[in-house]
């Protein structure tokens, strides 16, 4: 039976922020920042005095140098609506630093996330084409994805959430927060959140990169970084194409991204804009019955935010933000066949909104309050309510018209207070959420996070949070020969508990965590009877996810500077599900297919002079008929101040495996490339 499922497993993740009140971007969204394996890199898009803008000897360099010199107690994090330092924060977030990204054998953000034990990445195509990402046993629709604090998740479907307009070279760090976080990020943070933080250098430079390899794959990237006074700007673009590693998996990807920042005594500003485009053969991505599917997606986004500080001591900070993103999707059930009868659909989703966050420090702690209003508007040939003919909208490039419309407004009100006494932190907050797609009433989602730090090495923490997710337009309106949505679906609800501890000392750090998530009215695509031929979107009842994870890193370059191995990093996660329902469920497509076990191992070592190697091993076992598999990747790299040359191989054992349904993944994929960076 064809299974196209998606799930994530438990793992300790950590969000991290930068020093100084400098990351309004995160403060604005009340992001959760945390420090975990290896990074004290700051969390900001591009702040004039943020760590990401400082010279090589600063925080980023410290990721690969001496951690002991990092003043963790000075680093502000956003595990709460009011920014707290890393030591004060009651949250732990997993941070994938720029140094980690540069060493990894990775072609996309999705490849990087595969190395986080608690993240489940189910890939359909190479280079991150059509990827489902989930956390802690949830599904791909249950996480919030942010770019510099801007929520870029899609109300249409989570399948296209990973269409990022940035390349790996644009990224300062990736932060992963696991567990329900509605009171910080809003109702869409049902099982976790991922924030991608970009960078802009403090110097003028131009970077050009190119690569090529297996399956006719080639591509290139270029960027320009400008720093003038208090203004920092970066513009980048890239193109990649490939014949794909399996039948009908060819693709072409284009992207462009711009980010900037400006800083003054009382006001800091950050802004960004981006575009991504993908055209790809969709093989059997959505149905095993059709092997010649095709899809093309386009994404446009923009945001701007300010950090207003009436007093220089940051006793009160106001952070407004406005944002917009458009997602355009063209799908053909059979490549080249046009028309609704042939299974061709068009969708255009516009999401826009604004937020305002304020936080104040006073005698009894730190208090934060905020509001976010988000409007989602979809035009489609398949999703939404049928419109009168005089309201149909022409579709560019075809004689068809959008004849359906869906729209809803999501309003979130936030309130939080933080108490810090010695090594003890208590952070309690409340989200009041109203969505016009429901009954128009405000619903309350509280949360409490507690941590205790007996000394600089140890930290223990516990949390309890609630969240809700409304169905996507795909869940509600899909209707074709193999799938049927349901406009009567109820929203999902989640109550999550998490406990854990972190230990960090010179040359070593580890995080151990456990979680229990109680889900009700969980949405999945299932066969309602054993004889069913069509998957149906249903509320499948109660689904409890429980598990634990451990993530540890040994930084041998700090303990044994002359030893050829510089770092060893290992992680393991286990998850168990308990499902109960009043009716029968057969053939789960997503929610009941989860990673029971996942283990990761990374080893970095020197070879000769500037020549280094990075190895990554991943073993995982998925439930419901999937065979366990082991995958090994390697990257050889020669690094110099102005250039970088590398050869990387994905799946060096040439093992054929399946992440999702019967979508076969490629064997060994070898790429070689180089980049040059010139200052001016």
Indicate where each model-derived feature is located.
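N-terminal periplasmic "start-of-domain" segments of outer-membrane beta-barrel proteins
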Residues: 71-102, 132, 140
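Extracytoplasmic beta-strand/coil segments of soluble accessory domains associated
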Residues: 110, 114-150, 154
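Short strand-turn segments of transmembrane beta-barrel domains in outer membranes
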Residues: 192-193, 198-226, 235-249, 292
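Flexible loop and strand-edge segments within Gram-negative outer membrane beta-barrel domains
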Residues: 242-253, 268-318, 322-351
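Outer-membrane beta-barrel signature, preferentially recognizing the C-terminal barrel domain
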Residues: 287-311, 347-349, 439, 459, ...
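Structural signature of Gram-negative outer-membrane beta-barrels, strongest in the C-terminal barrel
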Residues: 322, 364, 397-519, 565-566, ...
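Gram-negative outer-membrane beta-barrel transporters
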Residues: 420-425, 516-518, 539-622, 675
């Amino acid at each position: 039976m064809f299974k196209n499922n998606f799930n994530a497993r438990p793992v300790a993740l950590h969000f991290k922020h930068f020093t100084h009140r400098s990351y309004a971007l995160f403060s604005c969204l009340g992001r959760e920042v945390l420090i975990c394996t290896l990074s004290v890199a700051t969390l900001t898009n591009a702040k004039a005095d943020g760590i990401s803008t400082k010279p090589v000897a600063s925080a980023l360099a410290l990721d690969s140098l001496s951690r002991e010199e990092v003043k963790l107690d000075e680093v502000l994090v956003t595990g709460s609506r009011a920014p707290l330092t890393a030591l004060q924060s009651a949250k732990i977030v997993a941070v994938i630093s720029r140094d980690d990204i540069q060493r990894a054998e990775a072609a996309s953000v999705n490849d990087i996330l595969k190395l986080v034990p608690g993240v489940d990445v189910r890939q359909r195509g190479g280079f991150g084409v059509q990827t489902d990402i989930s956390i802690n046993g949830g599904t791909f629709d249950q996480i919030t994805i942010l770019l510099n604090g801007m929520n870029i998740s899609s109300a249409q479907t989570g399948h296209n959430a990973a269409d990022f307009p940035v390349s790996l070279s644009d990224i300062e760090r990736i932060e992963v927060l696991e567990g329900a976080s509605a009171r910080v990020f809003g109702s869409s943070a049902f099982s976790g959140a991922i924030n991608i933080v970009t960078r802009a250098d403090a110097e003028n430079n131009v970077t050009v990169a190119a690569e090529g390899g297996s399956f006719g794959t080639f591509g290139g990237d270029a960027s320009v970084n400008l720093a003038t006074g208090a203004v920092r700007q970066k513009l980048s673009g890239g193109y990649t194409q490939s014949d794909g590693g399996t039948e009908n998996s060819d693709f072409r990807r284009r992207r462009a991204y711009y980010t900037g920042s400006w800083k003054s005594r009382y006001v800091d500003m950050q802004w960004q804009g981006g575009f991504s485009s993908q055209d790809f053969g969709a093989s059997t991505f959505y149905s095993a019955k059709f092997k010649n599917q095709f899809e093309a997606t386009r994404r446009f986004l923009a945001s701007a935010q300010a950090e207003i500080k009436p007093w220089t001591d940051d006793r009160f900070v106001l952070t407004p933000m406005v944002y917009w993103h458009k997602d355009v999707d063209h799908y053909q059930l059979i490549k080249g066949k046009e028309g609704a009868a042939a299974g061709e659909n068009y969708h255009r989703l516009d999401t826009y909104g604004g937020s305002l966050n304020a936080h104040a420090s006073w005698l009894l702690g730190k208090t934060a309050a905020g509001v976010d209003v988000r409007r989602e508007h979809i035009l489609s040939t398949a999703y939404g309510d049928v419109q009168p003919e005089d309201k149909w909208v022409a579709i560019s490039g075809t004689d068809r018209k959008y004849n359906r419309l869906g729209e809803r407004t999501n309003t979130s009100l936030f309130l939080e207070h933080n108490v810090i006494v010695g090594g003890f932190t208590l952070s309690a907050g409340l989200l009041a959420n109203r969505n016009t797609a429901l009954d128009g009433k405000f619903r309350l989602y509280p949360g409490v996070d507690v941590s205790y730090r007996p000394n600089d090495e140890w930290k223990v923490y516990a949390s309890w949070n609630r969240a809700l997710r409304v169905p996507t337009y795909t869940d509600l309106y899909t209707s074709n020969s193999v799938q049927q949505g349901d406009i009567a679906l109820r929203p999902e609800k989640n109550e999550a508990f998490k406990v854990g501890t972190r230990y960090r000392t010179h040359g070593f750090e580890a995080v151990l965590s456990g979680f229990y998530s109680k889900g009700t009215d969980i949405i999945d695509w299932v066969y309602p009877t054993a004889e069913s031929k069509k998957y149906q979107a249903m509320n499948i009842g109660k689904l409890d996810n429980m598990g634990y994870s451990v993530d540890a890193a040994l930084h041998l370059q700090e303990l044994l500077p002359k030893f050829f191995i510089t770092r060893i990093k290992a992680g393991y996660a286990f998850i168990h599900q308990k499902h109960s329902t009043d009716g029968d469920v057969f053939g789960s497509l997503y929610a009941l297919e989860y990673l029971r076990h996942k283990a990761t191992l990374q080893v970095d070592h020197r070879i000769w002079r500037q020549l280094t190697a990075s190895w990554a091993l991943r073993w995982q076992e998925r439930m419901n008929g999937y065979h366990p598999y082991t995958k090994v990747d390697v990257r050889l790299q020669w690094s110099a101040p102005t250039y970088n040359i590398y050869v990387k191989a994905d799946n060096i054992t040439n093992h054929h495996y399946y992440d999702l349904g019967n979508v076969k993944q490629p064997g060994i994929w070898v790429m070689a490339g180089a980049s040059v960076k010139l200052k001016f």
